[in-house]
Design a protein with these regions (language model features):
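Alpha/beta-hydrolase fold nucleophile elbow
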Residues: 181-194
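A catalytic-pocket lid/entrance helix-loop region that shapes and gates access to the active site
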Residues: 204-253
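N-terminal cap/lid segment of alpha/beta-hydrolase-fold proteins
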Residues: 3-58
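Glycine-rich nucleophile elbow surrounding the catalytic serine of serine-hydrolase chemistry
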Residues: 192-202
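Alpha/beta-hydrolase active-site loop
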Residues: 123-180
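Glycine-rich His-Gly loop
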Residues: 68-72, 193-194, 231
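Active-site signature of alpha/beta-hydrolase-fold catalytic machinery across serine-
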Residues: 81, 176, 202-207
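Short, surface-exposed "cap/lid" segments of acyl-processing enzymes
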Residues: 56-128, 133-134
């Protein structure tokens, strides 16, 4: 059909991927956190919280820390481009004082059962057939064979990796990197993309000690604000109110 408007002029690029990579680093980190065995034993990999840390290579004290959760079909690495560009832009801006940002992107615990061997090898080789052969044709990679796709009966322990696990994992990452509660209130932000943005709102209202008479442990008491990407919400004080319009990059602080 007809385009709704004429194409816009191409925006001049003022930096390259190499510029960003020279300034910003991405690190894969883990926190030991034994998973529940209530519904059966779990693989050793599931006893770790997995996440990525994005920060300036010089590793200065951050002015702000963003803890982000991915959408329903994504993992923590989905934030790689956004996090790096955001950190670079904040540090190199000329219209105001540079900011030192840090981004922590947290995987949901059930990502621990993923076998990314074929996908990683295909990406490195720039050949999708490598992944197809590994996952569907029984071709090993570095001596490793794909163990097959799992059914629910194979992974009963996933029943314990629900909403509470997500909240506890994100809180553990946040408090590990920003241990001072006052610092968290001043410079830590919780957020996410799509479903991850919804989970950010859940975090803000989560009661971490299970005692409704205490408030210091509540999620909203441990962050300076909430950031949402590709999401919308309805104000809690009105069931009749229409959701606020969502934008492609929308933040609520």
């Amino acid at each position: 059909g007809t385009l709704p408007e004429p194409p816009k002029a191409r925006v001049a690029v003022d930096h390259s991927t190499a510029d960003v990579d020279a300034l910003v680093e991405q690190r894969f980190l883990q926190l030991a956190s034994p998973a529940s065995t209530f519904n059966g034993p779990v693989p050793a990999a599931c006893d770790q919280i997995q996440y990525y840390q994005f920060r300036l290579r010089s590793a200065p004290e951050p002015d702000a820390v963003l803890v982000l959760m991915p959408g329903v079909y994504s993992g923590a690495n989905v934030f790689s481009y956004l996090a790096k560009e955001l950190i670079y832009a904040a540090h190199t801006r000329t219209d105001a004082a540079p900011l030192n940002l840090e981004v922590l992107a947290v995987d949901r615990r059930d990502n621990c059962i993923e076998d990314l061997t074929g996908l990683n090898a295909a990406e490195q080789a720039r050949d999708t057939q490598v992944a197809l052969d590994y996952y569907f044709n029984g071709v090993p990679l570095d001596g490793q064979l794909f163990d097959g796709f799992k059914s629910s009966d194979d992974v009963p322990y996933l029943s314990e990796m629900g909403l509470a696990q997500v909240m506890e994992d994100v809180h553990a990452v946040l408090t590990t990197h920003v241990p001072d509660p006052l610092q968290r209130q001043q410079k830590a932000f919780i957020g996410g993309h799509s479903m991850g943005a919804s989970l950010a709102w859940v975090y803000a209202g989560w009661d971490f000690d299970g005692d409704e008479t205490t408030l210091a442990d509540a999620g909203y008491q441990n962050v300076a604000g909430v950031i949402r990407l590709d999401s919308r919400y309805t104000p809690a004080d009105s069931q009749e109110a229409a959701p606020l319009p969502a934008t492609e990059n929308d933040a609520v602080i």
